[in-house]
Amino acid sequence: MATKTAQPSADNLGSRAPVEPCGYIYVYPKEGFPFKEASLLGNKNVGASAMSLPLLSDLTVESNFSFNVKAVHKKIDMTTLLVRVSAYHREAIVFFNTDLFEPIFVGPGLDILCSDARSLFGYTNFVPRTDLRDTVDIKDLYAPFYSEDSCFMAVVVTEGFKERLYFGNLVPIIAQGLKVQINGREAVKIPLYDEDLFSKSHEHLPRFYIPSVSKYLHDSVFTSIAQALRIRDVESVIRASEKQSIQDQYKLAKIVNSKDFSLQSVKCQDASAFMVIDCIAAELAMSYGLSFLEAPQDPCAVLDYTSWPIFETAETEEDRIKAIQDWNAMMSVHVYTHLFSTNSVLYLTKINKQTQSNKSEQNVYNTYFMQHGLAYAADATQRENGEPAFSGAPKFSGGTYTLYHLALASSFSPHLLARNCYYMQFCQHQKSTTNANYSVPQYVGTAAASDLCELCQGTCPASCIHTLFYRLKDRFPPVLGSQRRDPYVVTGVSGQYNDLDMLGNFATFREKEDEAVQNAESEKYTYWQLIQNVVEKLSTMGVTEGTVGSELITDIQSFLKTFRDIDNVVDSEVVKFMNCLVKNNINFRETIKTVHHVLHYCCNVFWQAPCAMFLNLFYKSVLAIIQDICLPIAMTYEQDNPSIGMMPSEWLKVHYQTIWTNFKSSCLDRGVLTGSEHKIVHTDMFCDFLNIDSALSGQIVPMKMQVRLAKALLTVPKTIKIKNRIVFSNSSMTETIQSGFIKSATKKDSYIVTGPYMKFLNSLHKVMFPNAKISALYLWHTFSQKKQLPVLPGISRENMVELANYVETSSKMHDDMNVLDIIPTTLLTYAKVRLNNTILRTCGQTQFYATTLQCLLPTLQTISATEYPHVLLDQSIMSVDHYLSSIKDKHALTVQTTLKEDIATVGKQRPIVTVPLVVNKYTGINGNTQIFQCGNLGYFMGRGVDRNLIPDSTGFRRQNNSSYMRRRHVFMTPMVAHLVKKNSNLNNLTFEVETIRKNVQNIFEDKDNLNIFDNVVLELVKGLGDSCENITEDDLQFYLGEYYIMSDEIWSRFQIITDSGAPWSVENVTKVLGCNKQEECKFEFVGVEEQLSCVPPQIEEFAPQATLSTLAASRKRKITSILSDIDL
């Protein structure tokens, strides 16, 4: 059936972007600038002549700065400008008076280390241009506005023109310098235009070329991109990127001639296909990935520096500095997770091919994959024509991680390496049992303080990178060359909406629109609404997020009441929920098998954390995922068009344009990457501009120009979907994997100790049994084994037996139905575990454990600095005793992770996320040959990543070691309440009377309760107190709502209470209502099929006729809605 393709809307960010220069040079006054705060956000290393700061409003740019622009490129004719839509690069590169900023890491010699590592692994070094004769003098930039010692300068540039900045092809117009206000300080911004805009008659254009700026871009930006594309010649990547952006060569292969291939891949059986697929992946990542990064995106609250919530309680400069340090410490978890993970995206070094397996039918679309392995980075390579490219690095002894590998992970950039070292200083070390001689004080006082160190010569032993590396050495991954297809770890920021509750996207009613049409009369009760209703009802009982029970439970009876009330709320809501599924014809037994946790990875570069290293991780993550998506497309195309006998460059000249066109329809909305195509227009016929040639000589002559867009259609990525399958699938799985999910059929004798109540029985043991001399563990373990209870003074036997019976019965029931490997630590978690276990049991899921998703949230801890020498900064150390005396009273800020927080709650706070991802590919059903993808959540590799990822070897549960396979983890750091304010929408505020009305109407829902009216009165008294004395019928109508027809019953009870003169309290009203309660009567109910004498005889004419048409009416309506357009 043919359908019309929806045309992209012209009302978008690109169309609304203003026409502006390619970038700006900012001249900032030194006075009043927060250098210490900015230094903590920057990436300056010791001795650097350039550094970067995040692009933030009211720190580096003005508050009304345009982050998306139509950047002017050149003139098509005398009256028409060619513009290119682009977002701004997220960094402001400081290049003048950088000495005003403090180094982020005080250890020296990082530039030497990075240069040596770059040469060791065969990557090209930066070579400054010598052919540019006419360059602008730095003095000419600041002299019209400030003196040399009173200012510093930085440059900002759009993504599409950063290559032009690197090569020195941008020209500043000093006469057009504009004064702007940046957080109350007056600064000047000077526009930068492309040299192509100027007349060819200008022989001496004052180009802006600063070697330190170009070197920064080469090392910190372009080397990272080259690594992601597996190319060692960084300069060739920059030239290719420039051609693509400036000459619109998106459909042409540009970097194939710069590719080199490992000798192992060249000598394999299908070497030509292997090389071609590698080249296709790199070319598509260049064409699509870099264009995605240039695309306009929505600016967000993260960019507003002055509105960061971390500063709300800061009163002094020291408070603000401490707030930034704490935030940096929380972010450090994500960085050192990458450095310590064997399968980090930083360690993706090649494209590999799976070997054929005879055990199961292998999915051919997953044949080629992104391979991690630091050992491959040292392999010798050759060009496509067989010429040697890289001779290989010497094999490192025993596969041990070295500082050169750390430099490789930092893209050989001393700036990124300094930032990584700063983050690692917050990391706690884990001593290996095989490292008996490990001693940080001994190392600092002896080896580090000697002149043998080639980086600091012993002058800075406490903060030298060698000392930091020694402290953390046992946590770094081994240098190996894996052959297995594993997930790779990526980092970014989560989207606004995620399905991270225990059953994820179950019962969202979003799957099929036709189901909604068929059952439009049935109310949709989604799983999300179920969770919200349970949470709201429990909150009225005092059970909220983090409630552990001590606030509600004071003795045995309150313990029983609290848990029974929670059980009643959960069970009643589950019954309503399951009934709704039945009414809506949802086959929940089949639907439950396909549910997933869904995490949305945001592709908006402006949402990324304000840090150069996180920007680097974002670039590498996006480029890796795009290459992963395109691998099966490249493989199938090469199979249809064999490359045997042709070099990759020759083959791509013929086929790349077709591949580029095909991939455009294959990358978006196929399961992983979502996005949209924007039609860019410029609504105004003319734009305000100036005579650019006369502006060079200082004369500003305004003029009107027409605008033509270089690209009218832009593909803008939105999110990357990462899914985690919840219910175990038994198909084609190995016994090892099954053993991690299958639930043991044998009954456990420790069902109470490992049950859902043990946490509360232990923490409230002294509250319920104040005179007990035995521990909670001994008491309940003895009871579960021998069915005996101790005789405790002050505790009645009846209460003790009632508690034991409840705990035993409920623990047994939990043990029978539990398929969630979660031990509740709060009352709300207990309720959610009971709720989801009940749903899973109703859906027939009792044989296998469900996969659980947990977040690793950073927590800060200040400890003694004895083993954290970096707090001494650049202090010299003479001996071990000198070190111990110097650090005696000092403390260090460190970070650890906790598993206590609910991932669904944290996922709503726009967290920074670090997740292991594997992209699986498959084809559609019913002969559909289109390739779809699914981004599945994977696992972290490496024992040093985090202590919470090390599987339990012992414990009460005595599980097998493969039980960790049913647990998935995500590192999360919330940005809401740190860099983004919480939503304070007044429409979301709840008044007290609303809560009272909701509680009252919830009571009416339990229509089987004989005392329903008494309970309503008690709820009103509980909420209103003495105000009940003045209650009116209008008030009752508000509180009762649709149940107002029952108001006479409520009103009569209020009259009784008023006449009694009792105070308006719950205790007194209970007594009054108890005294007036009538004796219970026994009622006899008769079925409607029995004819009663009082029922009038039925008139035959008015009786409904049961015909075949009425019995099948709903089915006919369903068929009619489907087949309405078919001529029968």
From Swiss-Prot:
Its main location: host cell. Keywords: DNA replication, DNA-binding, Host nucleus, Metal-binding, Zinc, Zinc-finger. SUPFAM superfamilies: Viral ssDNA binding protein. A zinc finger (unnamed) spans 453-466. It holds the Pfam family Viral_DNA_bp. Belongs to the herpesviridae major DNA-binding protein family. The keyword Metal-binding applies. InterPro entries: DBP_sf, Viral_ssDBP_head, Viral_ssDNA-bd. The lineage of its organism: Viruses, Duplodnaviria, Heunggongvirae, Peploviricota, Herviviricetes. One of its GO terms (molecular function) is zinc ion binding. Single-stranded DNA-binding protein required for DNA replication. Plays several crucial roles in viral infection. Participates in the opening of the viral DNA origin to initiate replication by interacting with the origin-binding protein. May disrupt loops, hairpins and other secondary structures present on ssDNA to reduce and eliminate pausing of viral DNA polymerase at specific sites during elongation. Promotes viral DNA recombination by performing strand-transfer, characterized by the ability to transfer a DNA strand from a linear duplex to a complementary single-stranded DNA circle. Can also catalyze the renaturation of complementary single strands. GO terms for cellular component: host cell nucleus. It is found in: Host nucleus. The keyword Signal does not apply. Residues 1098-1128 are annotated as: Required for nuclear localization. This is Major DNA-binding protein. One of its GO terms (biological process) is DNA replication. Homooligomers. Forms double-helical filaments necessary for the formation of replication compartments within the host nucleus. Interacts with the origin-binding protein. Interacts with the helicase primase complex; this interaction stimulates primer synthesis activity of the helicase-primase complex. Interacts with the DNA polymerase. Interacts with the alkaline exonuclease; this interaction increases its nuclease processivity. It comes from the Viruses.
